[in-house]
């Protein structure tokens, strides 16, 4: 994939659609997991976690999805998305993720920055950084 703003936006649109389907129980977790590279770095105010295997990434994503389901998650509206192509092999995607339940009520609103890298496996997320509050 040639990294340009439109290609990265399109890839993330597909990623969020896959994430939403999995979080609602309508999607296949293996489809979601193909969006993540390993190692995968996750950082937030709670600290830094480096996931070194596919199984570790799967467990973390399952934990996140379980938490969203407990809140009646239905979908995410990405507010103010920004894409910055860093070079031929990587790009940043940043947006505020308005997470809504089936009634359209927002229950979470983190701002998240993703680093996506393009290698022989295609574009994959290498870092997820949740902005502090």
Give the location of each predicted region.
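Short, cysteine-centered beta-strand-loop-beta hairpins and adjacent loop/turn segments enriched
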Residues: 99-107
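A short hydrophobic beta-strand element
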Residues: 75, 86-97
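A solvent-exposed, acidic/Ser-Thr-rich amphipathic alpha-helical stretch
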Residues: 29-81
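Short beta-strand edge/turn micro-motifs at domain boundaries
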Residues: 106-133
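Short, low-complexity N-terminal intrinsically disordered segments enriched in polar/charged residues
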Residues: 1-35
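Hydrophobic alpha-helical core bundles mediating ligand binding, dimerization, or RNAP-core interactions
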Residues: 12-19, 36, 57-64, 97, ...
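Short histidine/acidic/glycine/proline-rich micro-motifs that form metal-
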Residues: 18, 47-49, 99
């Amino acid at each position: 994939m040639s990294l340009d703003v439109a290609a990265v936006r399109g890839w993330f649109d597909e990623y969020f659609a896959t994430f939403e389907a999995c979080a609602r129980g309508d999607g296949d977790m293996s489809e979601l997991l193909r969006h993540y590279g390993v190692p995968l770095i996750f950082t937030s105010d709670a600290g830094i976690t480096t996931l070194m295997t596919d199984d570790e990434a799967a467990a973390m994503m399952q934990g996140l999805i379980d938490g969203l389901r407990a809140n009646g998650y239905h979908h995410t509206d990405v507010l103010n998305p920004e894409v910055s192509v860093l070079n031929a092999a990587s790009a940043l995607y940043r947006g505020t993720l308005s997470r809504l339940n089936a009634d359209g009520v927002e229950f979470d609103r983190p701002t998240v920055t993703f680093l996506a890298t393009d290698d022989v496996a295609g574009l994959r997320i290498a870092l997820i950084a949740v902005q502090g509050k």
